[in-house]
């Protein structure tokens, strides 16, 4: 069946894992406490703080306790939706201020542009919030790549290692799963996408293979039929 859409992961796939762990996460950890203190009374931020209290089971946590929980989640690399949303808000401020530029591999930039020009629909699925995804591509070192994408998906669509998440995304895209190619550097994510009926391709940028899936080292090596 012909591929009509491409769904791509970010970390380790379109972008260096080091950008997320060495640049974005430390930036959020440094700036998140003051950001929460300054904006805790705003509706959008307050909603996420309430979600932190619910997720942690600490309904009476004050702002300082919520900040401590968030910093602990960052240290543990927890994929928790309210944390991702708040990190996205902090990063948005950093991108607006010119302190951050999203990293996207040059081979990924070229391939994404070529696929878009060929009429393929491009989508992102990452554990980072949709807001954070848009910032990485919209404020990238290669310029604004946001217009290349038709949609973004995050953990609100479900965990990345569960096949139901990919079935849900295929439904949202409006295509049979078999017409969607999923790109990732994580075997468990590729397995889940395949179980949902998607085509899969692994990215192993340091070489090697991802068990049970076709694997390439660069977007330049991807042939979409």
From Swiss-Prot:
Bifunctional enzyme that catalyzes the enolization of 2,3-diketo-5-methylthiopentyl-1-phosphate (DK-MTP-1-P) into the intermediate 2-hydroxy-3-keto-5-methylthiopentenyl-1-phosphate (HK-MTPenyl-1-P), which is then dephosphorylated to form the acireductone 1,2-dihydroxy-3-keto-5-methylthiopentene (DHK-MTPene). It is an enzyme of class 3 (hydrolase). It holds the Pfam family Hydrolase. Its cofactor is Mg(2+). InterPro entries: Enolase-ppase_E1, HAD-like_sf, HAD-SF_hydro_IA, HAD_sf. One of its GO terms (biological process) is L-methionine salvage from methylthioadenosine. SUPFAM superfamilies: HAD-like. Keywords: Amino-acid biosynthesis, Hydrolase, Magnesium, Metal-binding, Methionine biosynthesis. Pathway: Amino-acid biosynthesis; L-methionine biosynthesis via salvage pathway; L-methionine from S-methyl-5-thio-alpha-D-ribose 1-phosphate: step 3/6; Amino-acid biosynthesis; L-methionine biosynthesis via salvage pathway; L-methionine from S-methyl-5-thio-alpha-D-ribose 1-phosphate: step 4/6. NCBIfam families: enolase-ppase. Belongs to the HAD-like hydrolase superfamily. MasA/MtnC family. Binds 1 Mg(2+) ion per subunit. This is Enolase-phosphatase E1. The keyword Cytoplasm does not apply. GO terms for molecular function: 2,3-diketo-5-methylthiopentyl-1-phosphate enolase activity; 2-hydroxy-3-keto-5-methylthiopentenyl-1-phosphate phosphatase activity; acireductone synthase activity; magnesium ion binding. It catalyses: 5-methylsulfanyl-2,3-dioxopentyl phosphate + H2O = 1,2-dihydroxy-5-(methylsulfanyl)pent-1-en-3-one + phosphate. Monomer. Its EC number is 3.1.3.77. It comes from Pseudomonas aeruginosa (strain LESB58).
């Amino acid at each position: 069946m012909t591929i009509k859409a491409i769904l791509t992961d970010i970390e380790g796939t379109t972008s260096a894992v080091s950008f997320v762990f060495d640049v974005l996460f430390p930036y959020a950890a440094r700036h998140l406490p003051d950001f929460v203190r300054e904006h805790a009374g705003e509706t959008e931020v307050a909603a996420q703080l309430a979600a932190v209290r619910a997720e942690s089971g600490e309904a009476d946590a004050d702002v300082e306790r919520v900040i401590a929980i968030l910093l602990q989640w960052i240290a543990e690399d927890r994929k928790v939706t309210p944390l991702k949303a708040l990190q996205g808000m902090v990063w948005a401020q950093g991108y607006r201020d010119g302190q951050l530029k999203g990293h996207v591999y040059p081979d990924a930039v070229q391939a994404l542009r070529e696929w878009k020009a060929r009429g393929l629909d491009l989508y992102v699925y990452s554990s980072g919030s949709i807001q954070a995804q848009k910032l990485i591509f919209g404020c990238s070192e290669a310029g604004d790549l946001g217009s290349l994408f038709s949609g973004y998906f995050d953990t609100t669509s479900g965990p990345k290692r569960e096949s139901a998440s990919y079935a849900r995304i295929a439904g949202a895209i409006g295509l049979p799963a078999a017409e969607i190619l999923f790109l990732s550097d994580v075997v468990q994510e590729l397995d889940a996408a395949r179980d949902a009926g998607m085509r899969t391709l692994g990215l192993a940028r340091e070489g090697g293979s991802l068990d049970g899936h076709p694997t390439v080292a660069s977007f330049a090596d991807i042939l979409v039929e």
